[in-house]
């Protein structure tokens, strides 16, 4: 017997995620390159990103070297690849110069954030295969954010690793000057999640926590 599906999210009605989607205007457009294995992953977070952000596009594949649509986007935007590579620049807290810093090379092109969605191994493979990504400006999150993941429902490569939604919200909040930190530790070596406020993106992160608990409820 066919299961009843929720029309908007295309999931069984018992697993509908629509209540965790909240419309959020992002000044910086988001492009997600998603590994094919993530498309039907019920615990994935890109569906929440795509449903919530007003400017979000998803391309599915593994080797994007000759992807015409992606190459057109790369040619028309100043692209920041969120990827913790050897040459990545760390996005700064309370630095409203972030956007200016990364748009100096070509002010005529709008800024765009690009995120790879997949396990660490699959994201690495996507990056290595996609030669057109290698020349992009790479950015990464500061450690106090990168190590503050609340992704409880999937096995991750390291403790407190971030989901695609968390990483994206943190990056957008940093780029757009939305993050506020309340802690006595000025070094920011350790910051508790409750001390991080991502402004415009905080409701999405709050709903992400609820999404985690919702998924955990199916484990009985």
Predicted regions and their residues:
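S-adenosyl-L-methionine/SAH cofactor-binding core of RNA-modifying enzymes
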Residues: 54-128
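Short, solvent-exposed amphipathic alpha-helical segments in soluble enzyme
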Residues: 46-51, 129-133
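Cys/His-rich short segments
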Residues: 1-27
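Short microdomains enriched in Cys/His and/or Lys/Arg
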Residues: 19-47
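C-terminal folded domains that constitute the principal catalytic or ligand-binding module
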Residues: 112, 121-220
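Short, charged, surface-exposed secondary-structure boundary motifs
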Residues: 43, 68-69, 91-92, 146-153
């Amino acid at each position: 017997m066919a299961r009843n599906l929720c029309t908007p999210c295309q999931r069984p009605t018992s697993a509908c995620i629509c209540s965790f989607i909240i419309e959020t205007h992002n000044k910086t457009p988001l492009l997600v390159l998603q590994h094919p294995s993530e498309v039907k992953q019920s615990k994935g977070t890109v569906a929440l990103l795509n449903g919530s952000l007003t400017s979000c596009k998803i391309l599915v594949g593994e080797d994007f070297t000759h992807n015409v649509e992606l190459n057109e986007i790369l040619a028309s935007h100043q692209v920041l690849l969120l990827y913790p590579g050897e040459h990545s620049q760390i996005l700064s807290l309370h630095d409203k110069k972030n956007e200016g810093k990364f748009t100096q090379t070509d002010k005529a092109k709008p800024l765009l954030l690009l995120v790879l969605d997949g396990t660490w191994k699959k994201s690495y493979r996507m990056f290595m295969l996609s030669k057109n990504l290698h020349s992009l400006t790479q950015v990464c999150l500061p450690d106090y954010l990168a190590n503050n993941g609340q992704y409880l429902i999937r096995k991750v490569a390291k403790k407190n690793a971030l989901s695609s939604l968390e990483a994206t919200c943190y990056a957008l909040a940093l780029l757009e000057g939305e993050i506020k930190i309340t802690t006595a530790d000025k070094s920011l070596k350790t910051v508790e999640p409750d001390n991080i406020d991502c402004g415009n993106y905080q409701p999405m992160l709050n709903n992400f926590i609820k999404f985690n608990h919702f998924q955990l409820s199916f484990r009985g």
